[in-house]
Amino acid sequence: MAVPKKRTSMSKKRIRKNLWKKKTYFSIVQSYSLAKSRSFSRGNEHPKPKGFSGQQANK
């Protein structure tokens, strides 16, 4: 069974962790911008949820 010879240093761990965080951050930003562009491509600046008529119900 393969076993690592030495312990990974804290600096290497930190570098690898930061790379992982950076990749996830950019993928989140990209997906958010894509979703934003798709919602605005319909022509509505503020799309309304389904079933919203804009009128208040009478009490």
From Swiss-Prot:
> What UniProt keywords apply to this chain's record, in alphabetical order?
Chloroplast, Plastid, Ribonucleoprotein, Ribosomal protein
Residue ranges for the region (Disordered) are 37-59
Establish whether keyword Membrane is in the entry.
no
Which N-terminal stretch is annotated as signal sequence? none
Give any GO molecular function from the UniProt entry: structural constituent of ribosome
Please tell me whether the keyword NAD is annotated for this protein: no
Q: What GO CC annotations are associated with the protein?
A: chloroplast; large ribosomal subunit
> Would you say which domain of life the source belongs to?
Eukaryota
**A biological process term (GO) from this entry:** translation
Q: Cellular location of this protein?
A: Plastid, Chloroplast
InterPro entries the record matches = Ribosomal_bL32 (IPR002677), Ribosomal_bL32_plant/cyanobact (IPR044958), Ribosomal_zn-bd (IPR011332)
Family membership noted in the UniProt record: Belongs to the bacterial ribosomal protein bL32 family.
Q: What is this protein called?
A: Large ribosomal subunit protein bL32c
